[in-house]
């Protein structure tokens, strides 16, 4: 959890143990969607096509994460969703106390934050 940047999840248990994942998926950040506040995007490593289970909710206008070109530095991060209701909950998560946890030196919630449900509104 990094205030005024993003909230990341999907890859670890509440005890900071890494979850198993499926195969990596191709980067689709050239879909025209932007990393704006409230949007949800796929997290990845420095390999543009390495996204698996981790995602993040943008809590700021993170235009530097947008696709600009099909190059190592320009691929960007694939936006695939948006928080339609519950942005107040996102803002509350953004304010939780963070610090070291598991493999993370900082920015890990000091109390478990669990997203209990999400709904697909449309494709």
Language-model-derived ranges and their functions:
Residues 1-123:
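Cyclophilin-like peptidyl-prolyl cis-trans isomerases
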């Amino acid at each position: 959890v990094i205030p005024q940047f993003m909230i990341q999840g999907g890859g670890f248990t509440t005890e900071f143990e890494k979850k198993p994942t499926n195969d990596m998926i191709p980067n689709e950040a050239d879909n025209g969607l932007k990393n704006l506040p409230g949007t949800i995007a796929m997290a990845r490593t420095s390999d543009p096509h390495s996204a698996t289970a981790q995602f993040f909710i943008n809590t700021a206008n993170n235009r530097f994460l947008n696709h600009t070109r099909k190059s190592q530095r320009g691929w960007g991060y694939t936006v695939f969703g948006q928080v339609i209701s519950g942005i107040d909950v996102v803002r509350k998560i953004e304010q939780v106390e963070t610090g070291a946890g598991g493999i993370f030196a900082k920015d890990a919630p000091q109390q478990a934050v669990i997203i209990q449900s999400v709904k697909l509104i449309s494709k």
